[in-house]
Amino acid sequence: MPALLVSKSPLLSGEVTIHGAKNSVLPILAATLLCRTPCVLHNCPDILDVTHTRAILHSLGCASERRGASVYIDPRSCAGHSIPPELAASMRASSLFLGALLARQGEASLSLPGGCPIGARPVDYHLLAFRALGAEVTEMDDTIHCRARRLTGAKITLPGPSVGATENAMLAAVGAEGVTVIENAACEPEIVDLAGFLTACGAKIAGAGTGRVTVKGGQPLTGATYTILPDRIETATFLCACAACGGTLTLRRTAPRLAEPILNSLTESGCRFSCTHDTIQISRDGPLIACRPVISKPYPGFPTDAMPVLLASQLRAEGQTDFTETIFENRFGYARELKKLGAQLRQDENTVHLRGAPQLYAAQLFAEDLRGGAALVLAAMQAEGESTIFGVKHIERGYDTLEAALQSVGARLKTVEIPKKM
């Protein structure tokens, strides 16, 4: 089985180019089903979740091709409405095909989706939106089936600002006759990016990025060429790597305005920054000071997906701080792995209390989810000796060439094949 061997890193130095946002490209790939002509997506990360999403498109009769950092999708031959269970189980974002298929085919069927084991993440809010638009929704065992002869615009009030439910409501609303208003919508930049793509294809959407999104549906969409937003979580990962190990890194083709929460926390820790409209330079040459307590919140608050890497960056910081998770109840599964390295932390329900340790030591670690896996890599880069990290597939779900990028700036890590024990 593949594993990462990670040794203590020297000071990091160099440049890293940030890829397109995982959390943008997945709903946008699903949205291509709404188009009647081909689409081209630039800055498309080459990650496992994109591979799985393209496989779903292929299973529905669509064609796609990758050329470098661009993906070409031809949805004209879309014929199916059911997503194969093995593909649905591969990632959470498979649920986004419900809204797109309902709008295009009038019918959608999906086994309950998979993804990272960081919490329940029910699709109840998604189904509420479909029902409001006039769809008949049935749930049997582990399968969801949606059907609508005609979708009609409506007011949808989400119980909470769910990113996935907002995206699914937008996708379905594009195919609904009339005006749909989504109240209590999520405000994340990836919502704005999805709206940008749909607008480029001819959709009429207002308010994306606010708590009230309006969609005037029923118009046919044509394919467009679109560039995916930079990944703010990948940005956070490299910023935290430099904070943890010290040195100077320049991140290119990123979006500093979307990284403000992580920049603020790392500034508190003693890091220095210089930013342009699409670059961030981070330097850390003095002691790392524990940042103020962090609480994950919906945008524009601190992103839950960036909390694991920030926590990992603080393992040897001077002082103590707290990390409170309010989005996913099982987010801190990686904390017990960090303890193997000698991290001085204690979990109290949804809060981790952390005191900086004078030294960390190599251990055998197991990644169980995407962001927790990235945290283990950053932690192992600070530990004396050579750590072994299993569960590499989780990291590959959301990072494009993470290993090579870290190697290029001085980190000592490599993927090896370790035989399974009989």
Give the predicted meaning of each segment.
Residues 1-422:
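Short, structured segments at the rim of ligand-binding sites
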